[in-house]
Amino acid sequence: MKSKKWLLGAGVTLSAAFLLAACGKSEKNADAPKTFSYVYAMDPSSLDYSVTSKSSTSDVIANVVDGLLENDKYGNLIPSLAEDWSVSKDGLTYTYKLRKGVKWYTSEGEEYAEVKAQDFVTGLKHAADGKSDGLSLLQDSIKGLAAYISGESNDFSTVGVKAVDDYTVEYTLNKPESFWNSKVTTATMLPVNEEFLNSKGKDYGTPTPSSILYNGPYLLKSLTSKSAIEYEKNPNYWDKDNVKIDSIKLTFYDGSDQESLIRSFTQGAYTTARLFPTSSNFESTKKEYGDKIVYSPQEATSYYLTVNVNRQSYNKTAKTDEAQKTSTKEALLNKNFRQALNFALDRHSYTAQLNGEEGANKIIRNSLVPHDYVQVGEKTFGELAQAELVSYGDQWKDVALTDGKDTIYSPEKAKVAFAKAKEELQAKGVTFPIHLDIPVEQTDVIAVQQTNSLKQSIESSLGTENVIVDVLQMTDNEKLSITSQAKVPAQK
């Protein structure tokens, strides 16, 4: 069996949803394993896919709920529940014809109802009523949606989505969008069965398999916090002949033991393994597996750091008085200070903690989306954005937005931007050094190393008399409660 497997090397970031869905839609492969076993890093806090777009939720939902369209392995949009669609001449109305006979199932595999056009109307209404964090992508696109979300209208029938009949769903847009179909692949646009939604009430979408319905290639069989997530192939799936993996088991991995991934792979417990060039067993693994170690292509997902410019909670902080809190807030609201931080971050060193020196540049991205994400006339998004950057000052002239190289890091530019910021901030009574709290999960070895790398590059570029990065190590739950899973702004 081992000879049939491949190790995934230092340049890869695995997403269970994308990997498993790709397996489910792959071409026939007689050697493909019938069970896929690997790891996951974060429990989903909710399965209410219409309302949350968190990756921990999306990783699950991508394998269990189908929408109108999906992407093939090349990124092309292809039919899923919509077997055909058309666009009006003015580009404002998109009409999708649904497959007949596609069913909703419970987590136990019991047939619940047929998937119908009204389910897509219900899904969008549930997203709007639940103030979904994915609405920003849609509210200016779909006619009447922004007014409904803001409360200007309380009549959802004025929103540009309707079930023409049981198998035809229609969307009306505010203006033509040539890229509209890419939006229907988002979780906010997935169908929801109204009867089931109402029957579950507040329990709908809680992180238990029975809280949602399934129409996709897999059924979620178990979800045990910080332990395991298990799926089984949906035997009644409309496209079951193209689902090649029968069962999936993902075991929780907290990042504390890098060597455990390759150990489990070697022992046959995992189907694949993420390798860390900084781990103690990397060289011996290279000798054993040789050319079976590969770098994956850079994926479309972007990971980025953000700053909290309106912090309200200080339950976890290194700050010792109110003056430090006020000074930090003023600094983060200052454009030149933020630019100084941007230029001071050594991205190559940061990613090398994960991928080693050889693979560090393979995952560097210099813009929020890939530079060639969209074409506008003869130019890519990256080319257009790069031309616009120059208008922000000469410091951006030599910054390239292509992937694979850190073109932003420059201690010299950081110092220039910081000097401007310091003058502006001192005029407001801000005191230095500015203290920046950065929370990190204490058991995640790589995350701690990356955060320390960030601290080193910023402090060496700007000077500790000016900026101090305070690394706050804490548990996974503590970190999530003040960041991505904070329930209200006052907790952040």
Regions inferred by a protein language model and the residue ranges of each:
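C-terminal motif of bacterial Sec signal peptides marking the signal peptidase cleavage site
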Residues: L19-A22
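Periplasmic binding protein-like
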Residues: Y38, R263-Q267, K292, S457-K492
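N-terminal lobe/hinge region of extracytoplasmic solute-binding protein
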Residues: V39-K89, L213
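Aromatic- and charge-enriched surface segment that lines or borders ligand/interaction sites
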Residues: E83-L137, S264, S327-L333, R338-A340
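Surface-exposed binding/hinge segments that line
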Residues: K97, D119, H126-F196
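Gly/Pro-rich hinge or "lid" segments in bacterial periplasmic/extracellular proteins
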Residues: F156, Y167, L173-K249, S260
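Extracellular/periplasmic solute-recognition and catalytic clefts
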Residues: K221-P235, T251-T320, H348, A352-E357
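Append "and occasionally in soluble cytosolic enzymes with long acidic Gly/Pro-rich linkers
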Residues: L332-S460
